[in-house]
A protein has these predicted regions:
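Structural cue for short, hydrophobic secondary-structure segments
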Residues: 60-63, 100
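Short, flexible loop/turn elements at secondary-structure junctions
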Residues: 47, 63-65, 105
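Extracytoplasmic/secreted envelope proteins and their assembly/folding machinery
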Residues: 41, 58, 81-85
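Beta-sheet entry/capping signal
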Residues: 56-58, 97-98
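Flexible, glycine- and charge-enriched loops at secondary-structure boundaries
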Residues: 6, 34-37, 73-77
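Active-site machinery of serine-nucleophile hydrolases
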Residues: 67-120
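Bacterial Sec-dependent N-terminal signal peptides
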Residues: 1-24
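A domain-start/cap signature at the N-terminus of enzymes
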Residues: 18-57
């Protein structure tokens, strides 16, 4: 299996693992590399609605803090997926998509160095 196919298979498995841990909805992940820094972009579809001209988009920074505790540096997250689950239980089915943007990180060291200041 060549490297590209292996990488694609690995990314699909990672996204499926992430989606299985969400309370509701699904996430697509993309990685952007700029110079020596990487940034993960997560597109969260809480209600899996069709994206159309009525869809509202919310852009949130610090995506590593939004969904799963294992992604955070301190072991706690906002779990916004659970908030959307509560909305679904109260019959709120919003046509919304969350664009979650991670802080820029420089990989390849024992600890990835962040460039949070670059976000501001």
């Amino acid at each position: 299996m060549n490297k590209a196919k292996f990488l694609l298979l690995f990314l699909i498995m990672q996204v499926n693992h992430l989606n299985s841990q969400l309370a509701i909805g699904s996430i697509e992940e993309f990685f952007i590399e700029h110079n020596a820094y990487d940034r993960r972009i997560q597109i969260y579809y809480p209600f899996n609605n069709q994206v159309d001209q009525n869809t509202k988009f919310v852009i949130m920074n610090d995506a590593e803090e939004l969904f799963l505790e294992e992604d955070t540096w301190r072991g706690k997250s906002w779990r916004i997926d659970k908030t959307f689950q509560d909305l679904a239980k109260s019959s709120e089915n919003l046509n919304i998509v969350v664009i979650a943007v991670n802080s820029a990180k420089k990989p390849g060291k024992i600890l990835n160095s962040t460039r949070r200041y670059a976000d501001y």
